[in-house]
């Protein structure tokens, strides 16, 4: 069997740690024959373990410690430490591996509870499990999630040629906001979510770019962000935002305007790459060999 988990783009502006969307890049785990010891075959990086030290197996064995070892093949086009949920995809894959081999019959909500407990927040793991757009919260161990269709639009990801670790991106955030700042920031988030659910991408785009929770503190960590935002705005994009903690920059635009936006961005002296993406509507799934 093969376990497939989509990449995810979290926050979407003001939906800090609570809103995310699944997109069309994938982690795939092919489950092969039983053996005496675990082996993960991959070419993702020399520093990524091939045995039980791999996060995938740490998660699976944390849930079902006595799983029969197997040979696994891991492939992924989800870039590491780029703000597209690479670690979350591995967490969700590990849960699904335990679910399948341990015959746990976990519901999606049970998977979300486990994944959120491990990850600490649901913004990436929720869409990785459910697909589509997910608005979720985790308060004192209680996780709630609403799944919805993302409005019709094109996604364009600018993926830089450098990493930005989440812990580094979080280190520039303020320790706290004043009550007035919190009210303003949450009201913008409310409008962004409501507009997305209503299919109003113009209003959603304005609210997404009006984020007060994190982007203004993080934007200088992604040197291309300001220029990309300027170019995309001049050419009619709905919104441009930092995907997750960055450094990937996500552009949302109508189908007719995106080719123009992409062409203009390709003229810029950036060293990263542009990727056309779509919304993944399935989330984690298992395919028979």
Curated annotation (Swiss-Prot):
Keyword Transmembrane part of the UniProt annotation: no
Catalyses which reaction(s): L-homoserine + ATP = O-phospho-L-homoserine + ADP + H(+)
SUPFAM superfamilies in UniProt: GHMP Kinase, C-terminal domain (SSF55060), Ribosomal protein S5 domain 2-like (SSF54211)
One Pfam family per UniProt: GHMP_kinases_N
Cell location: Cytoplasm
EC number: 2.7.1.39
Disulphide-bonded residues: none
InterPro entries in UniProt: GHMP_kinase_C_dom (IPR013750), GHMP_kinase_C_sf (IPR036554), GHMP_kinase_N_dom (IPR006204), GHMP_knse_ATP-bd_CS (IPR006203), Homoserine_kinase (IPR000870), Ribosomal_Su5_D2-typ_SF (IPR020568), Ribsml_uS5_D2-typ_fold_subgr (IPR014721)
Record: residues binding ATP: 79-89
Pathway stated in the Swiss-Prot or TrEMBL entry: Amino-acid biosynthesis; L-threonine biosynthesis; L-threonine from L-aspartate: step 4/5
GO terms for cellular component: cytoplasm
Keywords on record: Amino-acid biosynthesis, ATP-binding, Cytoplasm, Kinase, Nucleotide-binding, Threonine biosynthesis, Transferase
Primary localization class, coarse: cytoplasm
Similarity-based family: Belongs to the GHMP kinase family. Homoserine kinase subfamily.
General function of this protein: Catalyzes the ATP-dependent phosphorylation of L-homoserine to L-homoserine phosphate.
Listed name of the protein: Homoserine kinase
Protein species of origin: Streptococcus pneumoniae (strain Taiwan19F-14)
Organism classification: Bacteria, Bacillati, Bacillota, Bacilli, Lactobacillales
Gene coding for it: thrB
């Amino acid at each position: 069997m093969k376990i497939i988990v989509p990449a995810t783009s979290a926050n979407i502006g003001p939906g800090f740690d609570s809103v995310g969307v699944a997109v069309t890049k994938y982690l795939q785990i092919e489950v092969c024959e039983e053996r005496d010891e675990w082996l993960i075959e991959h070419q993702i990086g020399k520093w990524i373990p091939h045995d039980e030290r791999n996060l995938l197996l740490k998660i699976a064995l944390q849930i079902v410690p006595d799983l029969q070892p197997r040979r696994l093949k891991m492939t992924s086009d989800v870039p590491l430490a780029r703000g597209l949920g690479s670690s979350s995809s591995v967490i969700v894959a590990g849960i699904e591996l335990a679910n399948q081999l341990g015959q746990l019959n976990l519901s999606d909500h049970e998977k979300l509870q486990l994944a959120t407990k491990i990850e600490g927040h649901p913004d990436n793991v929720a869409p990785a499990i459910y697909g589509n757009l997910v608005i979720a919260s985790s308060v004192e161990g209680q996780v709630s999630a609403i799944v919805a269709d993302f409005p019709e639009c094109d996604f364009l990801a600018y993926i830089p040629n450098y990493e930005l670790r989440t812990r580094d991106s979080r280190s520039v955030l303020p320790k706290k906001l004043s009550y007035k700042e919190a009210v303003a920031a949450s009201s913008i988030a409310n409008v962004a979510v409501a507009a997305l659910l209503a299919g109003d991408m113009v209003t959603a785009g304005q609210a997404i770019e009006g984020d007060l929770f994190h982007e203004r503190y993080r934007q200088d960590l992604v040197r291309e962000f300001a220029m990309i935002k300027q170019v995309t705005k001049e050419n009619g994009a709905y919104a441009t935002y930092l995907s997750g903690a960055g450094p990937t920059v996500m552009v949302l635009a109508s189908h007719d305007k995106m080719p123009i936006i992409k062409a203009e961005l390709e003229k810029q002296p950036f060293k990263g790459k542009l990727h056309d993406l779509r919304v993944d509507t399935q989330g984690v799934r298992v395919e028979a060999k």
